[in-house]
Amino acid sequence: MSEREQMKLDMVKNLALMLLEREPQLSMEQALATVLNSDTYQRLLRDSTGLYHQSPQYVYAFLESELLTGRSE
């Protein structure tokens, strides 16, 4: 596994944990499914976005906006 792939996996884990902190009624499976089925996740996978280099809080803001509005920005 490359360093870039590891950074992306760590970001997914961190996003799921942040989602659980804000929505404690979710299970870990639900939190991971939310992240993995999001447009934010698709953007994270694209190297050209550089999101894997950003802080989890920064990337979570995109996920949170997507969840609130139903679309990614």
Q: Residue spans of the language-model regions?
A:
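C-terminal alpha-helical interaction appendages
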Residues: 1-73
